[in-house]
A protein has these predicted regions:
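Short helix-coil-helix linker/hinge
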Residues: 104-112
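Residues within helix-turn-helix
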Residues: 33, 126, 137
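A short, charge-rich alpha-helical start-of-domain segment used by transcription regulators
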Residues: 1-23, 27, 33, 112
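DNA-recognition helix of helix-turn-helix
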Residues: 132-156
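Internal acidic/polar
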Residues: 73, 80-105, 124
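Structural recognition of an alpha-helix C-terminal capping motif at a helix-to-coil junction
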Residues: 23, 37-44, 48, 57-69
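Arg/Lys-rich amphipathic alpha helix in sigma70-family domain 2
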Residues: 51-54, 65-84
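A short pre-motif secondary-structure segment
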Residues: 114-118
């Protein structure tokens, strides 16, 4: 695939899936402004590095990985994990939603990524493995452990 064709594929994916990338960034950083910055920086990097895209078929997974990497870079710069008190919760949110948000916030960053990708972004285990550069079995076992941690925190 030629460089111009790759750039076009990346640009089209960014346009078609912008909301999805924003939701992913927002679910990781829980700030509208920061999520917008992350998506903008991710889009720029995706276009500039489009020659490293190997196959058109994986463009969405590739861009999701860039968004996650940018969110991780954001946290490294801030040295601060998102706090439930900073979340924009509507009055319709129930105590269960708040408890779930707190439980998810208490997970390690990689664990939180897996849970968000699986249950909030509806990614398949295989897609998560590609995005996180892990084996499918590793993702499955981490997801299982995360669900156990969440269950204990929500029941206790």
């Amino acid at each position: 695939m030629k460089k111009i064709a790759r750039e076009e594929v990346v640009q089209n994916a960014l346009i078609e899936n912008y909301e999805k990338y924003y939701r992913l960034a927002y679910s990781l950083v829980r700030s509208e402004a920061d999520a917008l910055d992350i998506v903008q920086e991710s889009a720029y990097k995706a276009i500039m590095k489009s020659e490293s895209l190997r196959t058109e078929e994986f463009v969405d997974t590739w861009i999701c990985r860039i968004v996650i990497n940018e969110a991780n870079a954001f946290f490294r710069k801030k040295r601060d994990l998102p706090d439930v008190s900073e979340m924009n919760l509507s009055t319709e949110d129930t105590y269960t939603d708040i408890d779930l948000a707190r439980a998810i916030d208490s997970l390690e960053p990689k664990e939180r990524e897996i849970v968000i990708l699986r249950y909030f972004e509806d990614k398949k285990i295989e897609e998560i493995a590609v995005i996180m550069n892990e084996k499918v079995g590793t993702v499955k076992s981490r997801l299982y452990r995360c669900m156990e941690k969440l269950r204990v925190r929500l029941e206790g």
